[in-house]
Amino acid sequence: MAAKEVKFGDSGRKKMLAGVNVLADAVKATLGPKGRNVIIEKSFGAPLITKDGVSVAKEIELKDRFENMGAQLVKDVASRANDDAGDGTTTATVLAQAIVNEGLKAVAAGMNPMDLKRGIDKATIAIVAELKKLSKPCTDTKAIAQVGTISANSDHSIGDIIAEAMEKVTKDGVITVEEGSGLENELSVVEGMQFDRGYLSPYFINKPDTMVAELDSPLLLLVDKKISNIREMLPVLEAVAKAGRPLLIVAEDVEGEALATLVVNNMRGIVKVAAVKAPGFGDRRKAMLQDIAVLTGGTVISEEVGLSLETTTLEHLGNAKRVILNKENTTIIDGAGVKTDIDSRISQIRQQIGDTSSDYDKEKLQERLAKLSGGVAVIKVGAGSEVEMKEKKARVEDALHATRAAVEEGVVPGGGVALVRSLQAIEGLKGDNADQDVGIALLRRAVEAPLRQIVANSGDEPSVVVDKVKQGSGNFGYNAASGEYGDMIEMGILDPAKVTRSALQAASSIASLMITTEAMIADVPEDKPAGGGMPDMGGMGGMGGMM
């Protein structure tokens, strides 16, 4: 086991504070509409230029191990805020730095760290409750566009395209961000339910010019097993042929004789048919088949529920207005499912999203929810170079997270004003003793830090602006982009309440733990021997007689 170095008390805390300040100073330069860029060296390719706080934080590793511990803890603050609300990483970092700096001064002055922590916790709970009171619902497209614009560093084109995407696919829809090929941002929306499985045979194609198979007003046969024997399908195929409607088969697989017979029937025009593999694997496949069944008003043919292909009738089949299959995807448009059944399925999936702790499962459930409720929108980011593309894509993703958070918990005045206004919640707040009162006062000063930093980055005097904002009330604040004072909501400067809340909670949680640190343990760096020289060759002297 490697030897350890231990630092106690003030000497350890000073090192930790130095690390906190290095990381926070790099990150906070990006805050606000006039935040600066940070350039990050990459091991290959061009350096990365970014104004994204979490991208800056992720890159920082310090040589001194004790300083690095402080930096990594603040990095954790940024990650927590990002995981919870998808944005607010820079605000969380600025708050954490302010709380740690103020807190460690109080500890050095002889205050009890545990009481300071209790005071900070008490004040945080009161401010979070006040933020919830200050928040206004965010439902209209204009407000959503404003939130997206602010989060994307005042880029109106990003805010507008996100608002348009949300309007088209609803708040439950999936919006994905991809790299585009042009200079402008583009939005494409997939209507209906799409899943990533294409036709099983190119012989199903009936539109050779676009290489797709299109079925108008089809019936859907949903089967939870492999189909290889055509005989078991004959009754249902005959019934479909009599009905004179096309048929889409969605099964675990269709192979061998069954696939060949379907192709022949399709080419001869006996039954217009197409077959596709069911999306997903294992239990997820069963769930997605059930989703398609609910959406189209059909029944999944599964031995688990006592149904077999031989006994399948037209009543078991789903209905849709149209189905389009290409090589990679299948889209079901306007399924004939009962609305109450679809709503019930949606609420069931929402419940599962709330219950699961796995990010992967959550993402897959969110996709299923979107396919049932809204649809899928793809934002293609346009840029003039690869470096600009990476930077812009990160901003679009941030803005997308921020708008989702705004729809979820509402919006508050932006530009650090909401935190300053929420101070009224702790005006008369008292702790159980004098040290807890210091903890409350400490947080009162710290929550001004984001506003101060936004003003500093815009080149103005922080103290003057903070005093003027404090003298105002309601939504009155400072627009750093234009240098004007006024109503932040009317000026379109909004922050999602969830982002502000998550930033404060993450910052006060980690910062108060750092204040109560008494010992720090790190590995002692090993002295590696200088390489390059050959080992001692002294034993070669006896070779002289070989001449």
UniProtKB/Swiss-Prot annotation:
It is found in: Cytoplasm. InterPro entries: Chaperonin_Cpn60_CS (IPR018370), Cpn60/GroEL (IPR001844), Cpn60/GroEL/TCP-1 (IPR002423), GroEL-like_apical_dom_sf (IPR027409), GROEL-like_equatorial_sf (IPR027413), TCP-1-like_intermed_sf (IPR027410). Disulfide bonds: none annotated. One of its GO terms (biological process) is protein refolding. It is an enzyme of class 5 (isomerase). SUPFAM superfamilies: GroEL apical domain-like, GroEL equatorial domain-like, GroEL-intermediate domain like. Together with its co-chaperonin GroES, plays an essential role in assisting protein folding. The GroEL-GroES system forms a nano-cage that allows encapsulation of the non-native substrate proteins and provides a physical environment optimized to promote and accelerate protein folding. This is Chaperonin GroEL. It comes from Pseudomonas savastanoi pv. phaseolicola (strain 1448A / Race 6).
